[in-house]
Amino acid sequence: FSDRSVSDISMVTVNSFDDYVSDLDMFIREIVMKREGRRPLYLYGHSMGGAIAALYLEKHPEVFTKAVLSSPMIEMLYGNFSHFAVEAILFVASVLNWNDKYLPSQTPYTDEYDFESSCCLSRARYDYIYKCKVEEERYRTNGATYRWCRAGRKASKYIKKHAQEIKIPVLLCQAGKDYLVSNASGH
């Protein structure tokens, strides 16, 4: 489980995606490498985890042999908002000190079962995640903050600028119906 920098445990917020990369590096070096020894390591990352995996591969090119990135969050989609509009909104939110406020349409966790309006296409997967959240309070992360969005945009720019630093084979998988992550950014 991750520590929360805010009292609302359902709020997804981070100063920098480098925090996630540091956590992953500590896990890999302190647990995985000690347990697995010199065996080849393969990295799998999905969505936001795919962005974290890409950052990790760029910053630690010697650790993994191969990787799979599934719908990696190399670039987020913002509905009808242009990138310029998103930057303007994030700037205003920063000036108003809304960093740890929920983004529009983002909300705290509720235990309401609502597969139909979720971003999930698999009911079995939704049911599994729903059960985990009901049973364990620390799984109840739900809504992103302005701070998280800003950190995500910065991470996306870094990933694209430094993609050539990934030297291992990477299988890139995309979800045709994904409306949260841009498929075009993975090319």
Regions found by a protein language model. Give the residues of each.
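Glycine-rich "HGGG/HGxG" loop immediately N-terminal to the catalytic nucleophile
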Residues: F1-V14
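Alpha/beta-hydrolase active-site loop
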Residues: V12-M33
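Alpha/beta-hydrolase fold nucleophile elbow
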Residues: R35-S47
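Alpha/beta-hydrolase-fold enzymes
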Residues: M48, I52-R140
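Active-site nucleophile elbow and catalytic-triad environment of alpha/beta-hydrolase enzymes
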Residues: G143-H162
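Short beta-strand/loop motif that positions the catalytic acidic residue
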Residues: I166, L172-Q174, D178
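Short alpha-helix in the alpha/beta-hydrolase fold that links the catalytic acid
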Residues: I168, S182-H187
